Regions:
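Conserved Rossmann-like nucleotide-cofactor binding loop
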Residues: 12, 19, 113-114, 163, ...
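Active-site neighborhood of HAD-like aspartate-dependent phosphohydrolases
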Residues: 1-41, 64
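A metal-dependent, Asp-based hydrolase signature
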Residues: 19, 30-33, 43-81
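Substrate-recognition/cap helix-loop segment adjacent to the acidic, metal-dependent catalytic center
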Residues: 93-106, 110-134
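Short, acidic loop-to-helix structural element flanking the phosphoryl-transfer center
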Residues: 57, 80-106, 140
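Generic enzyme active-site microenvironment
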Residues: 6-8, 108, 157-158
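Conserved SAM-binding loop
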Residues: 13, 105, 157
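Asp-based, Mg2+/Mn2+-dependent phosphohydrolase catalytic module
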Residues: 1-2, 121-216
Length: 216
């Protein structure tokens, strides 16, 4: 049986909340407190408008037309050269290795096609999954494409967002194969569901490191 694992990145393989804290510190050092506040205001406005984090769009809205070229480059470098590898969760790499023994592993993430790809590549995760990666603004709207790109007898979805798991489950028929889901209680979305096993997912775990022991 061919099992394809679809794994999210932010707060699933990589501690995005902790990375944002460090990014905020670096932004403040570069821009000052006032302009950093303007950046995060633009960040949330862009996310509300498009339903996805878009760093290039956020940067464009943060810097006014008089911002120097040096400042623009420094801000872009802050994100494009950030050490995301340092924020990979303990046990995440071992989980990927375990899943690859069962079948193909695909990174399936939301985000803009520039920054999100850079984040995943710089973290080293792309190499671990042999370059198999799909990035969409809203991945739950692309099950037909996912199924066509990675046909399988069965799918395993691992994500930290309850809403993503619910939407994948509701549209599972589009994958042309049954789907098993794992909710990982990491990051800010962990508080969205009550403590204990969540009935919306096949499995609920506290850490990405728990996957090998749970699946055996």
């Amino acid at each position: 049986m061919r099992i394809t694992s679809l794994i999210d990145v932010d707060n699933t393989l990589l501690d995005n909340d902790a990375a944002k804290v460090e990014i905020d510190r670096r932004l403040t050092a570069l821009l000052g407190a006032s302009e950093t506040d303007r950046f995060w205001t633009a960040y949330e406005a862009v996310r509300a408008e498009f339903g996805v984090v878009d760093i290039p769009q956020t940067m464009a809205r943060t810097l006014d037309s008089e911002a120097s070229l040096e400042k623009r480059i420094a801000l872009a470098d802050l994100f494009m050269c950030f050490p995301f590898r340092d924020y990979i969760y303990l046990g995440a790499l071992e989980t990927i290795t375990f899943l690859k023994a069962r079948g193909p592993v695909v990174i399936l993430s939301d985000g803009d096609p520039v920054f999100q790809v850079t984040k995943i590549v710089r973290s080293g995760l792309t190499e671990l999954v042999d370059g198999q990666m799909l990035i969409y603004p809203h991945k739950e709207e692309h099950l037909l494409e996912i199924g066509a790109a990675f046909p399988a007898d069965r799918y395993l979805l691992i994500d930290d967002k309850p809403t993503v798991i619910e939407r994948f489950t509701a549209r599972a028929a589009e994958l042309n194969g049954p789907i098993e889901t794992i909710l990982v209680r990491q990051g800010k979305y962990a508080a969205e569901v009550p403590a204990g096993p969540w009935p919306g997912a096949t499995h609920t775990i506290a850490s990405i490191a728990d996957v090998p022991a749970m699946l055996g």
